[in-house]
C-alpha cells in the first residue's frame, strides 16, 4: 500500500476516534471578488475549541496511548494548547517544552489545563530538541507536532469534511508549516478525489509573489 492510501485510511480511523471530541468546522465563502465562475471558501478551523486544527492530531495521537504513559512535546503555542486539552480530557500526564519568548496568552492557556511547562532558551527548534532529549531518558513518550502518522492522520480528517461540504472541489490551498497538515489533508483528498489539485503555501513563497501588508 502506498503512503497516500495508508494515510487516507488511517485518517478515516482517526475520524471515528475523535469525531465526538472536535467541531466539524464550517466553510465560509470569501468576500473577495474573483474571476467569474470561481468560488473561494475558507475552512474555519479557528472555531475549534483550542483555536486551531492542532486539536485533531493531538486527540488522534493521545487517545491511542496508555494513560500510564507520561507524555512530552514541544511547541510554540497551538500544538501545546491542543495536547494540553487532549491530555486533560484523557487523563494523561503531559509536559510541554516551550521557547522562553512564547506569547503570554498561549503560555497561560497551556498552564490552564494543568500541564507542566518547561521554558527553554532559544526558538521552537531548540525546544523540540530539548523535548526529544528528555524523551530519550525513557521517562516520557515524545509527541511530534507534525512528524507522526497519528498526528498527520488526525489533521487529515479535515479532508473528509472538505469533500462533504464542497463536492467536486477543484483546488485546495494548504499552509505547509511542518508538513503534517498538508500531508494529512492532501492524502485524504487525493485518495478520494484524484482530480483535485493540492497546492502548498508557505510564507516565503507568498512574499516572493505578493508584497507584505505590514512592514
Please give the residue ranges for each predicted region.
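PLP-dependent amino-acid enzyme catalytic core
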Residues: 1-215
